[in-house]
Amino acid sequence: MQKTILKEATHIVLINSFNNFLPESKERNFILRSLKRMEIKIIKGQSKNMLKEFIHRSFMPNDINNSFKNIFYKSLENLNKTLLLNDLKQLYINRDFPVFLKKDFKIIFIKSENDLILDNESNDNFLDFLNRTLDSKPIFINLAHQGHCLNNFNLYEILFNKLND
């Protein structure tokens, strides 16, 4: 996203977001090992099945739309391993305050109840941080029956209803 867009923005919608992916709890070592296994599979050219499983878990508890699944599987043929590895390595980094945030942003923070990708602690820590740091507390929306990737619901309707309460 272009920085000028963020500089001009007054509202931001964060969906299943984090500042630091790795939690501080005992789950940290498990997640580190999982990331390392993913890294090794990418390096060894064994990433197709891993990515299929990742996408499947991203949508759980919902099913993946067949047209999306077909597009995704087809895109695995042209996978940029270098870019994928670089993105994966970003998950190891602990960050301070996100540079794109201004303290006067109005933030809508959406969290999926059944996210199997992002550890609850990482998500909750980011929300706690925003609550302490921003001028006004984020608007919190908890989505039942949704995974990391949102599926079969109307985001516009949810945002409209929440903002007009």
Predicted regions and their residues:
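Hydrophobic/aromatic beta-strand patches that form the interior of the parallel beta-sheet core
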Residues: 11-15, 108-110, 141
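Catalytic histidine-centered segment of alpha/beta-hydrolase-like enzymes
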Residues: 117, 142-158
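Conserved alpha/beta-hydrolase "acid-adjacent" motif
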Residues: 116-122
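Short beta-strand/loop motif that positions the catalytic acidic residue
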Residues: 102-103, 108-111, 115
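Flexible "cap/lid" loop of the alpha/beta hydrolase fold
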Residues: 9-42, 84
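The feature captures the conserved acid-bearing segment of alpha/beta-hydrolase catalytic domains
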Residues: 95-102
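Primarily recognizes the serine-hydrolase "nucleophile elbow" in alpha/beta-hydrolase
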Residues: 1-10
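Conserved alpha/beta-hydrolase catalytic His-Asp/Glu region
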Residues: 44-92
